[in-house]
A protein has these predicted regions:
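Sec-dependent signal peptide cleavage junction
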Residues: 18-26
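Low-complexity, Gly/Ser/Thr/Pro-rich intrinsically disordered linker/tail segments
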Residues: 633-666
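Gly/Ser/Thr-rich loop/hinge elements
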Residues: 323, 327, 505-564, 598-606, ...
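Short, well-structured beta-strand/strand-turn elements
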Residues: 315, 570, 583-597
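Bacterial N-terminal signal peptides that target proteins for export
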Residues: 1-7
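Flexible, low-complexity junctional segments that flank or bridge functional domains
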Residues: 25-495, 502-504, 508-513, 520-526, ...
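Bacterial N-terminal signal peptides
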Residues: 9-18
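Active-site-proximal beta-strand/loop segments in catalytic clefts of secreted hydrolases
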Residues: 349-350, 369-370, 466-470, 499-503, ...
C-alpha cells in the first residue's frame, strides 16, 4: 500500500508540475486584437441582394440560419448540420424584392459542432464556427434535413462567406465573415489564410479568442476580430450565382460581352459545333446598325436572330409581339400531322374555314404548299417558338407554323383527299382564326389553374398522376406528392401512370428527389460540368455527384410504373423521366422523345431591360457521358403515329400505358 501511495503521489506531482507548463503553452498563442469590444454579437442583421433570375423560383419557405461550418473545416461535402445547431432568423422585408433584409438573434448557448482549429497538434475543446446563410425549406418540419441541404456540406452562395467559385477549387472559403463561438478564452483561431491561401490548414497563423461570440472578418489581412453587439452582415451572392449584367453598355458593346460569355461558358459549343467567331461576324453588324439608328426593334430582332441561330431549346429569344401577331394571325382553318410513313395529313379542319370551303377534307394528304413540295416547305420554315435542341421537336413546330401567314395572304395548297387518285390544287386566302393554331399547340388544354401535381384513381384500379411543373411551389409539390404516395401504399394500388407530357421543367434537384420515392437504393444519377476559370476548361467535380437521397421506407412506392412522355416534357421533366429508366424502374410510353433540353441555366441582362438565359452546365451520366441534350429521353414503349392513332377518340398514349400495366402489374 505504501508503494502505491508513493506512486500516486509521484503521478500527482508530475501532473501538478505539468500544469504550469501547459498554461504557458496556451499563453504563447497571442490574443486576438479586438475591435468594437461590446461583449460580442447578440443580434445580427443584414441584407441579401440577388440578381439571379431563378432565385425565388418555387420558393415557399425561405430561411436565414446560422450555418454550422464544421463541414468546411473537415472538407466534408456530406456534412449534415444538426437541427439543434440551426438557429433560424427572421426575414424582415419582402423576400421577392431584392435586396431583402433579415435579423437573427444568437443563442446564449449554441449547439453547433466544436472544431479544434489552432493547428498545434494537441486535442483542445475547439470553437463553433458559423456562417450566416440563406436556405429554403421544402421537406419535413421547420428545420433543414438532408434533402433540403442538397446532401450536406456548406453554402457556396448567398452566405456571409466568399467562396472560390471554380469547381476544381473544392469551394474553398476565400473571404467574408464568420461568427465564431469560443466556450472559454483558451481556444485558438486563424488570423489569416497562411502561405497556402487556405483556411484551417497547418500554416494558419493563430490567435486566441475571448470567450463567447466574435465576428471574424476574413476580407482583411490579418483578419479583423469584432465584438460589436449588433453587427451588420450582408450575404454574398457569389460570382457563380450572380447574373452577368451588360445592361449599361451600348448595343454593340453588350453583344461583344455576350459573345465572349458564350464562348467561355456555354456548355455545348463542341457538341453543337458552334463557331463563335462566325456568329460574331454574322450578327455584330445587326447590332451596330441598330445602335447607329437608335432602333430598338432592330436591336430586339438582332438578339432574336442570334438566339435562334443556336440550336438550344433552353434559350429564349425576345420578339416584338406585334410582329409576331402579324406574321401568324392568318390561318387556313387546318392543322397538320406527319405520320410515321412520311405523309403529311390534315389532322384538324375548322368548320366553314378556308380549307373546308375549298374542298380539303379531314385526313387529306398535303402534297405541296405555295408551289414547293410539302417536305421542303416544312424544312425551310423558321418557327416563332425557336430555337430547339431536338430536330424532332423542331419538325413538329415547323408543321405548326408552316401554315400560319399574315392575314389576307393568298396560299396555294396541293392536296389529295381520302379516296382520290389525283392531287388537286387550290388557292385560298387566310382569315383571322386561331382554333387550328391552338389545336396544334403542345399546351392544348392547359388553363394555368393546374396544381403542380394532380392525381386520381382510375376506374381500372390504377392511379394516374400528372406533374405539370417542377418550378411551382416546391413545398406544395412535395406535400401533394407524399400524399399521393401514402394513398398508393394505404390502398395497395398495383400500378401508377405518371403523365409528364406537359411539363416545362424547373428544379432538376426537385425532379431527382421526387423520382427517389420509387427506389430503395441511393443511386448515383450523374454529375454536371461547368466552366472553370482557373483551368480554362469545363470541369466536373467528382465529390458532388448527383444522387438520390431516399425518403423514409414508408414513403416509397414499389408498384409497377409507366411514365408518359412527349415533346413538351422539357428540362427537369426529362431528368425525372431519365431517372425512371434506371434499373428499368418504369416503362417510358410515348409517340415522341422528350424535348432534349439538358443544360443547366443561368440568366444575363442586356440593354433595354432584357433578361435572357443560356446553358452553362453539361449533364453527365454516371459514366461521364452527356445526356438529355439534343436527344431527350426516348420511349421504351413506342406508340405509332398513323391515321388510327391520330384520329382515335381516346388518349392513345394513356391507353398504351394501361395495356402495359395490365400485362405487368397483375
Amino acid at each position: 500500500m505504501q508503494v502505491k501511495r508513493i506512486v500516486v503521489l509521484l503521478l500527482l506531482g508530475v501532473l501538478i508540475g505539468a500544469m504550469p507548463f501547459a498554461n504557458a503553452q496556451e499563453s504563447e498563442i497571442p490574443l486576438a486584437t479586438i475591435v468594437n469590444d461590446e461583449g460580442g454579437p447578440v443580434n445580427v442583421t443584414g441584407e441579401v441582394a440577388y440578381t439571379s433570375g431563378f432565385f425565388t423560383l418555387g420558393v415557399d419557405e425561405p430561411l436565414i440560419i446560422l450555418e454550422d461550418q464544421a463541414g468546411f473545416v473537415d472538407r466534408d461535402r456530406g456534412f449534415l448540420m444538426s437541427e439543434a445547431s440551426q438557429v433560424i432568423g427572421k426575414i424582415t422585408s419582402d423576400f421577392y424584392t431584392s435586396p431583402f433584409t433579415y435579423s437573427l438573434d444568437l443563442p446564449i448557448e449554441p449547439a453547433g459542432s466544436l472544431r479544434d482549429v489552432d493547428q498545434d497538434g494537441d486535442s483542445d475543446t475547439g470553437v463553433m464556427i458559423y456562417a450566416v446563410a440563406y436556405w429554403t425549406n421544402v421537406w419535413g418540419d421547420a428545420f433543414l434535413e438532408e434533402r433540403d441541404l442538397y446532401g450536406g456540406g456548406w453554402s457556396a452562395a448567398y452566405a456571409s462567406t466568399h467562396i472560390d467559385q471554380n469547381p476544381s477549387s473544392g469551394y474553398e472559403v476565400i473571404g467574408g465573415k464568420y461568427i465564431v463561438y469560443a466556450p472559454d478564452d483558451q481556444q485558438g483561431f486563424p488570423s489569416g489564410f497562411g502561405e497556402d491561401d487556405k483556411l484551417f490548414t497547418d500554416d494558419d497563423p493563430i490567435v486566441r479568442l475571448p470567450a463567447g461570440y466574435t465576428l471574424v472578418d476574413m476580407d482583411t489581412d490579418p483578419f479583423t476580430f469584432d465584438r460589436s453587439k449588433n453587427p451588420v452582415i450582408p450575404l454574398i451572392e457569389g460570382e457563380g450565382a450572380a447574373q452577368d449584367d451588360f445592361s449599361n453598355l451600348s448595343y454593340s458593346e453588350a453583344f461583344d460581352e455576350m459573345i465572349e460569355m458564350f464562348r467561355k461558358n456555354y456548355a455545348f459549343t463542341e457538341l453543337k459545333g458552334i463557331d463563335w467567331d462566325e456568329k460574331k461576324a454574322t450578327f455584330r453588324p445587326l447590332f451596330e446598325e441598330a445602335e447607329a439608328n437608335e432602333d430598338y426593334l432592330a436591336y430586339v430582332n438582332a438578339i432574336r436572330d442570334f438566339i435562334w441561330s443556336i440550336p438550344d431549346g433552353h434559350l429564349f429569344a425576345p420578339y416584338d409581339d406585334t410582329e409576331f401577331f402579324n406574321a401568324i394571325s392568318g390561318g387556313l382553318g387546318m392543322s397538320l400531322r406527319e405520320l410515321d410513313d412520311g405523309r403529311v395529313i390534315v389532322s384538324y379542319l375548322l368548320e366553314d374555314g378556308p380549307a373546308e370551303i375549298a374542298g380539303i377534307e379531314l385526313k387529306a394528304e398535303i402534297v405541296t404548299l405555295n408551289g414547293k413540295p410539302i417536305d421542303e416547305a416544312i424544312s425551310e420554315n423558321v418557327p416563332w417558338s425557336s430555337p430547339f435542341s431536338s430536330t424532332e421537336v423542331r419538325r413538329l413546330q415547323q408543321l405548326r407554323y408552316v401554315i400560319r401567314f399574315p392575314l389576307d395572304s393568298e396560299v396555294e395548297v396541293g392536296y389529295q383527299n381520302p379516296g382520290d387518285s389525283d392531287v388537286a390544287t387550290v388557292t385560298m386566302k387566310t382569315v383571322e382564326e386561331f382554333d387550328s393554331f391552338r389545336f396544334s399547340s403542345f399546351n392544348i388544354g392547359l388553363t394555368g389553374f393546374e396544381n403542380p401535381v394532380e392525381f386520381e384513381l382510375l376506374d381500372n384500379g390504377y392511379a394516374y398522376v400528372k406533374i405539370y411543373s417542377f418550378s411551382d411551389s416546391e413545398r406544395l409539390t412535395i406535400q401533394l406528392w407524399e400524399r399521393m404516395i401514402q394513398l398508393l401504399n394505404d390502398n395497395g394500388i398495383p400500378g401508377l401512370i405518371i403523365d409528364m407530357r406537359q411539363n416545362g421543367g424547373g428544379s432538376g434537384f426537385l425532379a431527382d428527389q421526387m423520382a427517389a420515392y420509387f427506389f430503395d437504393e441511393p443511386l448515383v444519377l450523374g454529375n454536371s460540368a461547368t466552366y472553370d476559370k482557373s483551368l480554362d476548361a469545363f470541369y466536373s467535380d467528382p465529390d458532388v455527384e448527383q444522387r438520390y437521397f431516399l425518403p423514409p421506407v414508408n414513403q416509397r412506392y414499389n408498384g409497377v410504373i409507366t411514365v408518359l412522355i412527349g415533346p413538351n416534357c422539357n428540362s427537369a421533366c426529362e431528368f425525372f423521366s431519365y431517372n425512371m429508366t434506371l434499373q428499368d424502374r418504369a416503362a417510358i410510353v410515348g409517340q415522341y422523345a422528350t424535348g432534349g433540353l439538358g443544360g443547366g441555366q443561368t440568366t444575363f441582362a442586356m440593354p433595354e431591360g432584357l433578361v435572357l438565359q443560356y446553358s452553362v452546365s453539361r449533364p453527365l451520366d454516371a459514366e461521364g457521358n452527356i445526356i438529355i441534350e439534343d436527344t431527350g429521353v426516348a420511349p421504351t414503349v413506342k406508340v405509332p403515329v398513323n391515321e388510327e392513332t391520330v384520329f382515335a377518340e381516346g388518349d392513345v398514349v394513356l391507353e398504351a400505358a394501361i395495356a402495359y400495366l395490365d400485362e405487368n402489374a397483375g
